Design a protein with these regions (language model features):
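Short, surface-exposed coil-to-beta transition loops
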Residues: 28-30, 88-93, 115-120
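Beta-strand/loop substructures that line and gate deep hydrophobic ligand-binding cavities in soluble
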Residues: 96-97, 103-164, 169-171
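Extracytoplasmic/secreted envelope proteins and their assembly/folding machinery
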Residues: 39, 46-52, 92, 121, ...
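A generic structural micro-feature
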Residues: 23-25, 72, 85-87, 112-116, ...
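Short, highly charged C-terminal tails/helix-capping segments
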Residues: 66-67, 170-175
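Hydrophobic ligand-binding cavity/cleft-lining segments
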Residues: 3-73
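Flexible, solvent-exposed loop/hinge segments and secondary-structure transition points
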Residues: 69-76, 97-99
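Short beta-strand segments that buttress and anchor functional surface loops
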Residues: 77-85, 105-111
Length: 175
């Protein structure tokens, strides 16, 4: 009886591991909001890391988080590094491309609570009196993330933060 239960458990574990291994190697999380403001109003809030505390949902994860700004004041070459509690972790982001009022691209490197290297794009598209702002993050998904993804939806977790950040950008830009 014990050996039958053990075999069944091993088969279930093997099936879960095999299923996790077949999941996509890369991920993309994207959210979009329409803001009643021109791109010229929204763009500086994204392109200048010193303004991120006014809208980024990640700024509230740890009120004692240590932040370091270096490189350019804004735009390409601007760097933001942080180190905080278990929720905020430790990492660094750098603006690698900045096209006035239309695109900000970041290289995002996490050190803690896990290592990850992602790319982030903020795309601003004007349409009449409105601007469509898209926040997208792309990266590779190591096996452990594939396995965890069987039990939690990372798109929902990360997407929720993006939605809060975009709502904050909307509030600031429409004021």
């Amino acid at each position: 009886m014990f050996s039958t239960i053990l075999i069944i458990l091993l088969v279930i574990i093997a099936a879960v591991l095999i299923h996790a291994a077949t999941r996509p190697n890369d991920f993309v999380t994207t959210r979009t909001a329409t803001i009643k403001a021109p791109p010229e109003v929204i763009f500086p809030l994204i392109n200048d890391f010193s303004r991120w505390p006014t809208w980024s949902p990640y700024e509230k994860l740890d009120p004692n988080m240590k932040r370091t700004l270096s490189g350019a004041q804004s735009g390409k070459g601007a760097v933001y590094a942080w180190e905080g509690n278990g929720k905020a972790g430790k990492g660094r982001m750098e603006i690698v491309n900045s096209v006035a009022s239309s695109l900000v691209s970041l290289k995002l490197d996490f050190e803690k609570p896990f290592r990850a290297n992602n790319s982030v794009d903020f795309t601003l598209t004007p349409s009449g009196d409105d601007t469509s702002v898209t926040w997208a993050m792309r990266g590779s998904r190591p096996f452990i993330a594939k396995l965890m993804g069987l039990f939690m939806n990372f798109d929902t977790l990360i997407g929720r933060d993006f939605e809060v950040g975009l709502a904050n950008l909307k509030r600031l830009s429409e004021a």
